[in-house]
Amino acid sequence: MMQQQMKTKEDSVKCLKDFENLYANDKSETIFTNLATLYGNLGMKEKQAQFISERLAQDPNCFTAWAVKGQAEMNDSKWDEAIADLKKANEIKPNALVLTWLGYCNNNKAANTQDANQQKALLTETQAYLEKAKELDPDQKEANWRYLLYNTYYNLYGADDSRTKAMDPNNK
């Protein structure tokens, strides 16, 4: 794809213009996702946020817009915002990758809290997300949920728990 050919700033600008022109004629979710991601990758965070907001104004139930918005917030370590937006995407359409991102955000939020009860609650919520991701994508073709689920089981139940052992990446 065009993005794979970007090696210089000029390549990036050309690719961006090409995607903007494509999007002007084709508002498909694929083009939207590529353009929104490209804005983020090029450090154009404000443009990315505006672009996503415009899409959500047109279609408040756009799974892709909520997922891309949540991913951008996750990449910026904005855990609460990412969790809220990824939950919206998941409500619209349950998706293994979105559920895995939710688990990742919750794990990071748990790691940054000193309150053991809050950590346990976050990890329990993470467990539910990742188990649903496992159910939707047992072969991990969409999302690599296994290690996160292993880590979650390990933190909740310890190394000797059968769930932890079953997810241990060394025991494939």
Task: Cite the ranges covered by each PLM segment.
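Short coil turns that delineate tetratricopeptide repeat
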Residues: A24-K27, P60, K93-P94, P138-Q140
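Helix-start (N-cap) detector for alpha-helical repeat units in TPR-like alpha-solenoids
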Residues: E29-T30, F63-T64, A96-V98, K141-A143
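Hydrophobic/aromatic packing residues within the alpha-helices of TPR/SEL1-like helical repeat arrays
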Residues: L16-F19, I52, W79, L86, ...
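Short coil/turn linking the two alpha-helices of tandem helical-hairpin repeats
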Residues: Q3-K9, N41-G43, N75-S77, G103, ...
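Terminal, low-structured helical/coil segments at or just beyond the last alpha-helical repeat
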Residues: T124, K132-K172
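Single-residue signature of alpha-solenoid repeat helices
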Residues: S12-C15, Q48, A82, Q119, ...
